[in-house]
Amino acid sequence: MSNTRVHNPSASILSDFKEITKMRLAISVVFSSVAGYFLGADTIDFVTVTLLAIGGYLMVGASNAYNQIIERNLDALMDRTKNRPLPAGRMSVPVAFTIASAFTVLGLVVLYVINPKTAMFGAISIFLYVSIYTPLKTKTPLSVFVGAFPGAIPFMLGWVAASGSFSIEPGTLFMIQFFWQFPHFWAIGWWLFDDYKKGGFFMLPTGKRDRGTAIQIILYTCWTILVSLIPVFGVTGKLMLTPVSGIIIFLLGLGMLYYAIRLFKEKTAEAAKKLMFASVSYITLLQIVYVLDKFIREWI
């Protein structure tokens, strides 16, 4: 029996489409937006939820496609990214640009159907990510600070979609995800430091895998935990958190802090990788706890 594998062009095209839009990342961003919507909605409108998910996915996919167009030559230098559709030559720039442009237009239209402010914040996010954050990545470690702004929008975007306005509640959600960006992306920058160096990317605050970077990771992890607990004290409007849920969030934060301290002690790529996964677990579980806390308070 022959072991020859038949090449499936359709499967290859679909795979490249998923990669140029970073489907898995887009889905995680949609999760944040939907969580924010559940927190801000007085009654759940599943049509709005669907529009938010579709619009959010399209905007994130567009940002990722534009990013890969801009960085295609640098991606070719790094082991992690050299097999992406553009540097590998499986997709042309015009095709990628067409995908990005179509996603942008469709995404903005879908978000505008929800309400104008949701579309406005979606547009701000894609502009900051593509036009400012992406070019800065090869110029200064401050790119992480700039990138934290569009990166923090999805969680608050859901609340804006539910309420049609920006106030202290979505502002708090924004701050939680804003501070979280720093330990998360610095952990990635430490873990993949050698590969990023090949592409000329500046990801760590000191530019090195050193004590200074590790200390800043610990500090921003602490800030993330503290900001996450503010709703417990009843000072963030309709966004509230019961003491029990606050304790759960605090314990989750201690778990993330544990891995940040381990990175400080070990200063290894493996420790950074573990912190990266811990940070993803933290923000995901935090959003779940926030949503469950709201629903339980309403049911009791």
Swiss-Prot record:
Molecular function via GO: protoheme IX farnesyltransferase activity
EC class of the enzyme, as a word: transferase
Disulfide-bonded cysteines: none
EC assignment: 2.5.1.141
Stored PROSITE patterns: UBIA (PS00943)
CDD domains membership: PT_UbiA_Cox10 (cd13957)
Pathway assigned in UniProt: Porphyrin-containing compound metabolism; heme O biosynthesis; heme O from protoheme: step 1/1
GO biological process: heme A biosynthetic process; heme O biosynthetic process
Membrane topology category: Multi-pass membrane protein
Coiled-coil spans in chain: none
Chain segments annotated as transmembrane: 20-40, 43-63, 94-114, 116-136, 142-162, 173-193, 215-235, 241-261, 276-296
Record's GO cellular component terms: plasma membrane
Location within or outside the cell: Cell membrane
Pfam families: UbiA
Additional observations: Carbon 2 of the heme B porphyrin ring is defined according to the Fischer nomenclature.
Recorded family membership: Belongs to the UbiA prenyltransferase family. Protoheme IX farnesyltransferase subfamily.
Function statement: Converts heme B (protoheme IX) to heme O by substitution of the vinyl group on carbon 2 of heme B porphyrin ring with a hydroxyethyl farnesyl side group.
Identification of the protein by name: Protoheme IX farnesyltransferase
Organism this protein belongs to: Christiangramia forsetii (strain DSM 17595 / CGMCC 1.15422 / KT0803) (Gramella forsetii)
The gene coding this protein: ctaB
